A protein has these predicted regions:
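Conserved phosphate-interacting/catalytic interface
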Residues: 1-79, 83-209
Length: 209
């Protein structure tokens, strides 16, 4: 969405919306334009590629949801973070900040503008029933949107494990593969006590008794 007039000063320079498009014009991503429509900062969006109709917030939102995958979820998170006082930008080519495939929104550090510094948060927007590959989660902040449009933010990181053990399990230990686990019938005590392997069956038996 291209906005003219004094858009660069009013929206980009002062509030971090969009990216410069030459002169005073800026380009807005769909979530940015929808948020400005919702706030009343834009009165309408004109569809020059279609019927040239002036689209209200509702009409633009419905059209964007049909045109862009997961637009509604991304808009909910974008609007929520804006309402919390964050500057942020879509993670897409040409917009401030580094665009990466595994995140949807980029939040710069407080007191800076998008693209000025390394992002403080990389936001991946997901629905609460979506499955996520564990190896793609490190160093992302998940914005999980539930079926009632409530949003939970979950930070992820790559942990560092300190310490170790000098225990080496004895050779020749055998077990039975039962379903998705192995039962070692005659495991030595140090197998669990010092090697921290598995769970002793007698603990479960004591609980049952």
């Amino acid at each position: 969405v291209v906005v003219g007039g004094n858009a660069r000063q009013q929206f980009h320079d002062a509030r971090g919306y969009g990216r410069p498009a030459g002169g005073n014009e800026i380009r807005l991503a769909r979530v940015e334009a929808a948020h400005l429509l919702l706030r009343g900062d834009l009165t309408a969006v004109v569809d020059h590629d279609g019927s040239a109709d002036r689209l209200s917030f509702e009409e633009f939102f419905v059209a964007s949801a049909a045109a862009a995958e997961r637009f509604a979820l991304r808009f909910l998170v974008y609007a929520d973070l804006r309402d919390r006082g964050f500057y942020l930008t879509p993670a897409r080519a040409g917009w401030p900040g580094a665009a990466e495939a595994d995140n949807d929104l980029i939040v710069p550090p407080r007191g800076t503008k998008p693209g000025d510094d390394e992002p403080a948060y990389r936001i991946a927007v997901v629905g609460e029933r979506e499955s996520l590959p564990a190896d793609e989660l490190a160093n992302l902040t998940l914005a999980v949107v539930d079926e009632e449009s409530e949003i939970s933010y979950l930070e992820t990181a790559t942990p560092e494990f300190d310490g170790g053990t000098t225990y080496s399990p004895p050779a020749g230990i055998t077990g039975s593969l039962i379903g998705d686990r192995v039962v070692v019938w005659d495991a030595p005590e140090e197998f669990y006590d010092h090697g921290f392997y598995g769970q002793p069956l007698e603990v479960r038996e004591a609980i049952i008794d």
